[in-house]
Amino acid sequence: MAQWNQLQQLDTRYLEQLHQLYSDSFPMELRQFLAPWIESQDWAYAASKESHATLVFHNLLGEIDQQYSRFLQESNVLYQHNLRRIKQFLQSRYLEKPMEIARIVARCLWEESRLLQTAATAAQQGGQANHPTAAVVTEKQQMLEQHLQDVRKRVQDLEQKMKVVENLQDDFDFNYKTLKSQGDMQDLNGNNQSVTRQKMQQLEQMLTALDQMRRSIVSELAGLLSAMEYVQKTLTDEELADWKRRQQIACIGGPPNICLDRLENWITSLAESQLQTRQQIKKLEELQQKVSYKGDPIVQHRPMLEERIVELFRNLMKSAFVVERQPCMPMHPDRPLVIKTGVQFTTKVRLLVKFPELNYQLKIKVCIDKDSGDVAALRGSRKFNILGTNTKVMNMEESNNGSLSAEFKHLTLREQRCGNGGRANCDASLIVTEELHLITFETEVYHQGLKIDLETHSLPVVVISNICQMPNAWASILWYNMLTNNPKNVNFFTKPPIGTWDQVAEVLSWQFSSTTKRGLSIEQLTTLAEKLLGPGVNYSGCQITWAKFCKENMAGKGFSFWVWLDNIIDLVKKYILALWNEGYIMGFISKERERAILSTKPPGTFLLRFSESSKEGGVTFTWVEKDISGKTQIQSVEPYTKQQLNNMSFAEIIMGYKIMDATNILVSPLVYLYPDIPKEEAFGKYCRPESQEHPEADPGSAAPYLKTKFICVTPTTCSNTIDLPMSPRTLDSLMQFGNNGEGAEPSAGGQFESLTFDMDLTSECATSPM
C-alpha cells in the first residue's frame, strides 16, 4: 500500500501531526494529487545535487500539467484552479532554487515514515502506546465487548445450572429421607429388604449425577473466574492505563481525552457479573450444608473460588476509583497540575462502578503527600496543608451522565512554616518548581458484606507561591508527563531523564494548538530545533536534557529556551491570537530563511516573525525594498512587545506603519503579506473603523476637534535608507506624545529616532512636532 494511503487510515491523533507537516511551502493538495509519483522519486539525492534537483523539479511541473489535464476532462473546476495556483507558486518560488523544494519534500516524506512507524509500534504493543491507531482501538474494543458478553452469558448459564443442581439435590434429599424413614419402619416390622436395596441403588445413581453436576459447576466457575481475570486485566492494565496516559497527554496540551462513559459501562458490567458469581458461590455453600458426602467438590474448591472472586472484585473496585479531572486553578485552565498557594483549585474523582446503592454512601477525604512525607522531609521539600472543603460525599446527581463522582471546587494549599522559612532542609537539591507533590483521595466501600479501602492519586503537581514561577513550573509538568507514565514518581527531578527532539517537538506544537487553532509546522519546528540544538539536517532522535530545555541560557542570550518560548506563547494568546489563527504570522523562521524567501519577492512584501532576542516575547515584521541603486534590501523593525501592544493592536500598527525620509514624506513600506496577500485584505478587518475611533463632536461645542489617529513612523534619511533602524520604539512614546504633543526621544540604542505621530485626518498630512 502506498505511504499516503496508509497515512489516511491513521487515527485522528496522528492525522493532526500529519497536518502540521504541510504548509504553503509544499501544499498538502499537491501531495494528495501526485502521491504515487512523489513517493517514487529520490528527493534526498535531489536535495544534495542541484542538477538532479533541477531535473526532478521540471518533471514535477510536467506531472502537474498531466494531472491538470485529467481534471480538465473531469470538468473539476475547483481542482483545476487549485492546481494552477500551486504550479504558479512553485515556479515563482523554486524555479531558481530546486534544491530547496527537494529538501522540503524529502523531510516531509521522512516525517511521514516516522509517523507510520510510531503507529505500527503502537499496534504491536497492543494499544499501550500513547496514541494507538483507530483500527487497533476498534478491533480491541470489539474483542473486549465480545469477552464481556461471553462472561455475562456464562454467568447466566451457570445460574440455570445452579437451579438444576438445586432441584436435583432437593429430589435426592427428599428421596433419601423418605427411604431412611421407610427403612426404619421396615426394620421394626421385619419386612423384606429387597425394595429398600433397589431404592438405595436409585439414590446412589442420583448422588452420582449430583456429584457430576457439582463438579461441572465447580469447573465452570473456575473457568469463568479465569475469563473474568483476563477481561479485568484488559480493562485495568490496558484500557484504563491507556486512558490515564491519554489524560496525561491532554493535560500538557495534547489531543483531548475521550470520555469515561464507555469504560464505566464495561467495568460496571464486569462488577455486576462478579457479584452475581459470588452469590452463586455462596449458593454452593448452602447446597453443601444441606447435602455433603465424601469427595464433595464443593468442600474441596469452594473456599478457593470464594477467595478468588472477592480478590477480583476488590481489585476491580480499587482500579475503578480514578481522578477524572486533575487539579487545576480555574484562572489557568490551560495549565493544570500547577497550584499556587492560597489560590483555589478544583479537581474531580469518579468511581467507574455505577451502582445506585452506593449513591451518597462514599465519603471522600483529600490530603497531600500522604505517602511521601518522610521522603519529602529527607529531600528538603516543602510541606503543605489542604484547606477548604476537603471532604465530600460521592453522588450521581451532580454529573450530567449520572456517574458516581465528587467534585472539589474550593480547595487551597497552605505551606507549613518551619524555622528556616518553610523548607525542611536548607540543603535541598531541587528548586521549588521541580518539587513534585501528590494529592490523595481516600474512601471506604461497604457492599454486600465486604469492606474495601479505596485510594487514588492525582498526577504529580507543582506548588508555587508566586505567579512568576508559573513558566518554570509548567515546564516541569511538561517534562514529567512527556517522559513517564509513572503516576507517583515524586523524585523524578532528582535525576531527570533525557528527551528526544521528536518528543519535545510534539509537545511544543501542542502548546500552540491547545490554546489556538494552529499548531507548529515542520518548518517552524525546524527553526526551534536549531535554537535548541544548533544547525543540522536531521534532528530526529537528537537528545535534549532537562537543563538544556529549561535551565541553561541559550547561546549568546541571557535567558533559557523555555523562558523565551513561553513568553511568545503568552504573547500569541493575549495580543495576536486572531492573526496567528489566520496563519498570517510565520513566527519561527531563521534570518537566512527569511532573506531567502523575501529576496525573490517584489518590494513591499513583508512577513511577520517572532523576535529571537526579546526575553519577554516580541513580534516584528520584515520587508523587502530596493535602494537607490536598485539593489534588494531586507529591513526589519524592532520587535513590538506586550507593553507596546497594550496600547495599539498589531494589526493597526501594520496598517499604519510609515517610513519618513529627510523631506518628511511618509511612505508605507508594507504592501503585501507574504506570499502575495494585500495588506488591507489581511489586516483591515482587525482594525477599528474610524467612526468608532472618533465619535461625533458635540453639536453644541464652539469648534469641533480635528480627527486624529496614531501611526508608527520610522524617521530616516535619503543617504541612509539602506540602514533602517532595527529599533523604532514607537509605542513606548505613545502616551507621552498623546499627552504633551512632543515627539519621542531617540531610542537609547538606536541610530535613528522612532516616533508615533498624531495624524490630522482632515488634511491627510502628518503633524510633526519637530
Swiss-Prot record:
PROSITE patterns: SH2. The modification N6-acetyllysine is found at K49, K87, K601, K615, K631, K685, K707. It is found in: Cytoplasm; Nucleus. The lineage of its organism: Eukaryota, Metazoa, Chordata, Craniata, Vertebrata. This is Signal transducer and activator of transcription 3. SUPFAM superfamilies: p53-like transcription factors, SH2 domain, STAT, Transcription factor STAT-4 N-domain. The modification Phosphotyrosine is found at Y640, Y705. Gene3D superfamilies: EF-hand, SH2 domain, STAT transcription factor, all-alpha domain, STAT transcription factor, DNA-binding domain, STAT transcription factor, N-terminal domain. Involved in the gp130-mediated signaling pathway. Belongs to the transcription factor STAT family. Disruption phenotype: Early embryonic lethality, day 6.5-7.5. Conditional, tissue specific mutants are variably viable and show diverse defects including obesity, diabetes, thermal dysregulation and infertility. Induction: Induced by methicillin-resistant S.aureus infection in the lung. Signal transducer and transcription activator that mediates cellular responses to interleukins, KITLG/SCF, LEP and other growth factors. Once activated, recruits coactivators, such as NCOA1 or MED1, to the promoter region of the target gene. May mediate cellular responses to activated FGFR1, FGFR2, FGFR3 and FGFR4. Upon activation of IL6ST/gp130 signaling by interleukin-6 (IL6), binds to the IL6-responsive elements identified in the promoters of various acute-phase protein genes. Activated by IL31 through IL31RA. It comes from Mus musculus. Signal peptide: none annotated. The modification N-acetylalanine is found at A2. The modification Phosphothreonine is found at T714.
